[in-house]
Curated annotation (Swiss-Prot):
UniProt KW keywords: Ribonucleoprotein, Ribosomal protein
Keyword Ion transport in annotation: no
Species this chain originates from: Koribacter versatilis (strain Ellin345)
Entry keyword RNA-binding: no
Family stated for the protein in its record: Belongs to the bacterial ribosomal protein bL33 family.
Any one Gene Ontology cellular component term annotated for this protein: cytoplasm
Pfam families: Ribosomal_L33
UniProt-listed InterPro entries: Ribosomal_bL33, Ribosomal_bL33_CS, Ribosomal_bL33_sf, Ribosomal_zn-bd
Protein name per Swiss-Prot or TrEMBL: Large ribosomal subunit protein bL33
A Gene Ontology biological process term: translation
GO terms assigned for molecular function: structural constituent of ribosome
Amino acid sequence: MPREIIQLQCGDCKDKNYSTTKNKKTTTGRLEFSKFCRKCRKHTSHKEVK
């Protein structure tokens, strides 16, 4: 199965807030989204971590 579960980590507080799936065959780079962080209480950049 090519899809793998990944975690998204806040760029400011380093808290792992979100989890999602990713197809590693078609998306080789790291994902980055602008998401709401409950700890920071604002929209921040969330990057993929293992």
